[in-house]
Amino acid sequence: LEFRRVLFRSIGIDLGTSAVKLLLMEESGKICNIVSREYPLFFPHPGWSEQKPEDWFAQSMEGMKELTKDIDRAQVAGIGFGGQMHGLVTLDKDDNVIRPAILWNDGRTGEETEYLNTVIGKDKLSQYTANIAFAGFTAPKILWMQKNEPENFKKVVKIMLPKDYLAYRLSGSFCTDVSDASGMLLLDVKNRCWSKEMLEICGITEEQLPKLYESWEVVGTLKPEIAKELGFSENVKVVAGAGDNAAAAVGTGTVGDGQCNISLGTSGTVFISSKNFGVDENNALHSFCHADGSYHLMGCMLSAASCNKWWAEEILQTKDFAAEQAPIQKLGENHVFFLPYLMGERSPHNNPDARGVFFGMSMDSTRADMTQAVLEGVAFGLRDSLEVARNLGIKIERTKICGGGAKSPLWKKIIANVMNLKVDVLENEEGPSMGGAMLAAVGCGAYPDVETIGKKFAKVVDTVEPDPELVAKYEERY
């Protein structure tokens, strides 16, 4: 038996906004290799954001070859996904991509979002899908395409999400999972099925939409020509995978009831898993299906670590984040504030036109004060979402943290005190790619369910405790 254990490996593919990150995992949870490959983002007009699905596929294939170059490729048993949510990928009758994918952070659908929220109405949307319309969601993008690109819209035979395009190219299975589908505004989240009413509103049919699976379910095996190109067995199982946030939650063990995870990636999220389906009355948080078979609430900030990246790289012209943070000493006493709305905002303000602001500067404000304000501004933004969940009566005393921004000790300390939570730091912070590999392991039968593997793999190595004095200072500033 021990011999077999080494022979089982799964691959997690995290299809991100700036790069695809691939992770190779042994059954024990040991990470054997990680590879990242970038692809371009296109901004054809202000506020638009697009990518070419072919780029995702090409870089994922190259990435898998690189990832497995030093192992016996016959050991690869399963492939799972985490991926950027909400993006609209459309294929024609010959399976060609009709137009570049319109991404989650694309802001062109203001009118369509407004139409859904006012003409159809938030109450109806919430009743059909447990959510209201956000500019980033998929349904408004479909309406936009219908109105602005009718020729393209007529050609649409398949509508899918970004990671589902990879699953389709690898396995030939036209599928999605319920966690990712929750962000389309086409899913009846409570009952985990497509909403007939929403399809009608968007002028599409169920045939154009992928078959729904739970995240760990096997959707197919590798196409023979793909297996051959990669040097993998044709029996490699492809599982449905999950949206990036649900996949990251699996990767960090945020499964089961009342668990919390904060992700500091390009966007920032507060993710709370719950056995019970629930919706807050103002729809300030997303209410989605979770990858473990249950539900979750999620607040999403459109700019989180990207605020810090923009501040350091664009404005200060440096990539040395640690050096910029080093002089910051006094927490809770900063007179400079930053509103982190560089791309508009989702939770809980839902305003695509919101913009970033620095205020409170005086002649003695320093570079470090402004850097600190950026870090604090993001933490305050995340707290907005936490407060909504607390008002729903969900008890949250600690949170896990992951994402690029979580590498900064200072930022973790700020978050612990702004949110008054114990912040658990995990041994590995691989998030969605790890979650994808774990879902594949469950799909291949190596583990009985997602909760088991989630609890087993998430190892807390450090906890940042809030300091009551700082908590009080930040409370005042919040």
Give the ranges of each region predicted by the language model.
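Glycine/Thr-rich phosphate-binding loops that ligate phosphate moieties of nucleotide
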Residues: 8-36, 43, 77-118, 151, ...
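Gly/Ser/Thr-rich active-site cleft segment
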Residues: 17, 125-243, 308, 340-343, ...
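A polyampholytic, Gly/Pro-enriched intrinsically disordered region
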Residues: 56, 118-134, 231-233, 258-261, ...
